[in-house]
UniProtKB/Swiss-Prot annotation:
Family: Belongs to the purine/pyrimidine phosphoribosyltransferase family. XGPT subfamily.
Keyword check for Cell membrane: yes
Catalysed transformations (reactions): GMP + diphosphate = guanine + 5-phospho-alpha-D-ribose 1-diphosphate; XMP + diphosphate = xanthine + 5-phospho-alpha-D-ribose 1-diphosphate; IMP + diphosphate = hypoxanthine + 5-phospho-alpha-D-ribose 1-diphosphate
Protein name per Swiss-Prot or TrEMBL: Xanthine-guanine phosphoribosyltransferase
Pathway as given in its UniProt record: Purine metabolism; GMP biosynthesis via salvage pathway; GMP from guanine: step 1/1; Purine metabolism; XMP biosynthesis via salvage pathway; XMP from xanthine: step 1/1
Membrane-protein topology: Peripheral membrane protein
Cofactor(s) of this protein: Mg(2+)
Residues at which guanine binds: D102, I145
Gene: gpt
Coiled coil: none
Species the sequence originates in: Rhizobium etli (strain ATCC 51251 / DSM 11541 / JCM 21823 / NBRC 15573 / CFN 42)
Binding-site list for Mg(2+): D99
Length: 164
């Protein structure tokens, strides 16, 4: 697998700080959330952090696969839907959490299931920004974010080509 020109590696410490910043931002809203629906798999880690910080005990998952080869976003496959009681009233009072909105396709699909829910993610790319209500950090569309759960310790090429 070749590395993209723009890589944004995120450490566990950085992700934890960013997820807590998202929790702070959500806590500042004039809204009470009765449940979190996390988009798996990326939403699992931020949902755990946010649920702790906001004391939300009810956590549900919606399982959608879109990155089948870890490089290119493909067709959306719904692997597991949302509990019917959380979808009542359009998902009002539900917080949907993901790690990233890239093209916005995944969030848009979940939004059809929960049109009144509040959508939050840690990172956003320009095409995905319109599909979420709250996020922390925006990166360019051509940047690939390397999340800590996807990485091991390996050599990284310098940003400047030929600089060693």
């Amino acid at each position: 697998m070749s590395l993209p020109d723009k890589a944004f590696p995120v450490s566990w410490d950085q992700f934890h700080r960013d997820a807590r910043a998202l929790a702070w931002r959500l806590a500042g809203l004039d809204q009470t959330f009765k449940a979190i629906v996390c988009i798996t798999r990326g939403g699992l880690v931020p949902a755990a952090i946010i649920s702790r910080e906001l004391n939300i005990r009810l956590i549900e998952t919606v399982c959608i696969a879109s990155y089948h080869d870890y490089v290119n976003q493909g067709d959306m496959v719904l692997l597991k839907g949302i509990a019917p009681e959380l979808a009542e009233n359009g998902g009002e009072g539900v917080l949907v959490v993901d790690d990233l909105t890239d093209t916005g396709k995944t969030a848009a699909q979940v939004r059809t299931m929960l049109p009144k829910a509040h959508f939050a993610c840690v990172y956003a790319k320009p095409k995905g920004v319109p599909t979420v209500d709250t996020f922390i950090t925006e990166v360019s569309q051509d940047t690939w974010i390397y999340f800590p759960w996807d990485m091991g310790f390996t050599y990284q090429e310098p940003i400047a080509k030929g600089a060693r």
